[in-house]
């Protein structure tokens, strides 16, 4: 019996169970007295604003729902319904380990556990998601995690003592959520449409929804290039990355104020969604983006210590640092992990010329830390650390390394460029530790 892993952040709830991976942002849409959640609900947010609720995780309580939304009495009913949908679509796991935000209050955690008791699965673990993520990194100084939710962002501060990552404090950043930043981005882009085409995509709900739908791909493109085109209803506007950098100003400034003056030994990590925000690298230099499956990786490696069967669940806010037992390339780049034992003896590994160290993958203007266990590159490929260095594994689109076809068992290092299929150029780099 496999345990499902549930990452609760309302900007993108995720569940992993066996080969299943579900993603479902915290949107609830009322359709004929029934609820739809996640991406289908988000796709109707501008079309049916009176039938949408996006606050039910953030404002989890048993107070009467205002404004009313169908048969739900309170936000707890909507949370219950989304959990049931995830359980149903995720293969109906019998047990779940949950990673939740440190911004959840004690009474909200108690209510969440009460809701889970009414679900067709058992919660066997409950952990602060920032601490779980922090255990993948660690720091000789302070470790900060920037979490972007729908209606606010959160800074969690942690320290590492005696090989354990411990939560110190949680600071909500009001008015800095994904929805507020999106609203500002759409405002800037709409102004560009009006200036360039005299067409205002926000005048009608349908074209406004189309603009919101186009936003993620446009931001990804701006992470690679300085300009991109956005097309809505046959009208096209040219958008410059620099024009959008002010949209995240409140978030970036609030995060800096919450962390205070950073010392060389301090470290800052952030949820992947933060990487879409223009200006991130310039306003928060040194910030490291988490991989998309970092929560899964952390929970899997910490699973034995998190599972609490046949007892009242405690909220875990301290975990062993995984880098004390797993060599991390961005911490100790010159030491390769020990080879795993093989059932069948392999032929001796031929000598491989030493490659320049690599700790990060440069994607446009954002440097993503490389994970020893593997970092997903897309289109069926990932890069992982072996006994001889960084190598690709997978099967998918054709791969070019330094503009030449990938060779079998090719070892990669700092300075090497990758291009998968028709995707953007990626480059392996070494980020020197701050001193």
Features from the language model and the residues they span:
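Conserved phosphate-binding loops in N-terminal lobes of ATP-dependent enzymes
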Residues: 11-99, 226
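Forkhead-associated
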Residues: 352-435
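Helical "lid/coupling" subdomains associated with nucleotide-phosphate turnover
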Residues: 220-346, 363, 371-379
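Phosphate-binding glycine-rich/basic clefts of nucleotide- and phosphate-handling proteins
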Residues: 160-241, 272-277
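Phosphate/pyrophosphate-binding loops at sites that engage ATP/ADP/AMP, CoA/4′-phosphopantetheine
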Residues: 83-96, 195-204, 252-267
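Phosphate/oxyanion-binding active-site loops and adjacent basic polyanion-contact surfaces
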Residues: 71-83, 177-182, 240-252, 295
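Gly/Thr-rich phosphate-binding beta-strand-loop-beta motif of the actin/hexokinase/Hsp70
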Residues: 1-31, 136-168, 185, 215-221, ...
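Small-residue (GG/TT-enriched) beta-loop-alpha framework at ligand/catalytic clefts
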Residues: 98, 103-192, 272-273, 288-297
